[in-house]
Amino acid sequence: MPRLLIAASGTGGHLFPALSVADALPAGWSAHWLGVPDRLETTLVPERYPLTTVNAGGLQGRGLKKVVQLLRLLAASRDVRRLIRRNGIDVVFTTGGYIAAPAILGARWSGVPVVLHESNAIPGRVTRLLGRACTQVAIGLPAAARRIPGCKAIVTGTPVRNSFLQTQTLPDWVPQGPGPLLVVMGGSQGALGLNRMVRPLLPMLLSEGCRVVHLTGSNDPDVNSIKHPGFAERPFSDAIPALLQHADLAISRAGAGSLSELAVSGTPTVLVPFPQAADRHQDANAACAAALGAAVIVHQHGPSEPTLRQTLWRLLGPRLRSCDSAADPLVSMAQAMGTLAEADADQQLAALLQGLVR
């Protein structure tokens, strides 16, 4: 029975692709999860896989602080090596983040192959520092390859949840009607800035017949400020697969996970990169979609600036005016977004892991 150690921690962007890969493995495989205390995995993972946690963190400090962090990394790597030996692990898979460093070092010290998945167009610090130590680096976007010279890189795409690959029905709370459906979602971080940019424009779109679903996040002080039969507002929703499949247009941040979900759904999108993202990696992610004609990039700006308003009217205007498809830019955008998709990314990664087991 092949044994896999999955090191994925912190956010849905790290956890959900790893869960998809674990689900794609054939019967007969067993998986053990490596995470960090008090993170999302401690609630999502234990009901499905045995979970071991280690204290892992970054190396951003200086002087004594950095020495302490380095010692903590070495201790965590030692713990991972013990875990690998105790459980007879055959291969390690990690999706990056803080937990990836001790997972990679522990695997190499144990002589076990390790696969690192990098979802962003600009690889993270762990990928840049330790990618060469990995047996294989799987990348979600082709643009990442040139930024990690010396790594054994292969393009697999970023796995999405199975619900995105199945036809979904819109829930009853979504506004009904003939007008185009606009879905606004800010993701787990950065929703507030996006909301402040988008919300002043929604009354105009609603008055023209557009239907709008706005996923605001949990900390927006201006929720319930818009009342309209064509408008629905929620902090979060489990119906994102259905929303994206049926949306005429989405407004979204440009995280790698969101971009993969938009791609497999074929959803034309206005991408607003989160300006505080590390290394501005969301700008690079968005550029990959824009280069294909699948998305339009609008950088975050104040509500009085016209850029987003002009973009939305250019994209949605033909459908609001019932023009023929030849004048509709969303048709070609949807087709282009589909070319960005790697719907079988989980299967590709599962096959890669299987090929590394002796």
Swiss-Prot record:
UDP-N-acetyl-alpha-D-glucosamine binds at residues 11-13, 120, 161, 188, 282. It is found in: Cell inner membrane. GO terms for molecular function: UDP-N-acetyl-D-glucosamine:N-acetylmuramoyl-L-alanyl-D-glutamyl-meso-2,6-diaminopimelyl-D-alanyl-D-alanine-diphosphoundecaprenol 4-beta-N-acetylglucosaminlytransferase activity; undecaprenyldiphospho-muramoylpentapeptide beta-N-acetylglucosaminyltransferase activity. One of its GO terms (cellular component) is plasma membrane. It is an enzyme of class 2 (transferase). It is a peripheral membrane protein. Its EC number is 2.4.1.227. Cell wall formation. Catalyzes the transfer of a GlcNAc subunit on undecaprenyl-pyrophosphoryl-MurNAc-pentapeptide (lipid intermediate I) to form undecaprenyl-pyrophosphoryl-MurNAc-(pentapeptide)GlcNAc (lipid intermediate II). Belongs to the glycosyltransferase 28 family. MurG subfamily. This is UDP-N-acetylglucosamine--N-acetylmuramyl-(pentapeptide) pyrophosphoryl-undecaprenol N-acetylglucosamine transferase. It comes from Synechococcus sp. (strain WH7803).
